[in-house]
Amino acid sequence: MGELRAASNGRFLLDSIGELRRAYALADVVVIGRSFGDLHGSDMMEPAALGRCIVTGPRTEDFAATADALRAGGGLVDATRDSLAHVLAALIADPVRRAAHGRAACDVVRAQQGATVRTCALARRVIAMSEARTREHA
């Protein structure tokens, strides 16, 4: 993909894989389109990490843990097909609200950083406990 630019009206639609990060960097609001149909959402962590205001539809099953964490942290705006236009208009008209949702989303990502290290440490403890029990019963 070459240079990514918004249309003259400031809007663009992207249906692509591997190019979303560049598009998210241009966005004031990111709509997770796959969450409005039968595709069950898309990963929201990239736009969250960039501090973008994220709008999702009701179908986020494939990314439920991420959606739940973002929603609980105030970093996700829920919409339906019927409410999407109204939700977007309200967000576009309110840069303070957009920024607050974006900051909240980014805070959720920051809180999750280090999860792999914590998971490995927990796995090591579980393995050590299992080995100790095995030795006790041997």
What are these regions (language model features)?
Residues M1-A138:
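Nucleotide-activated sugar donor-binding and catalytic core shared by glycosyltransferases
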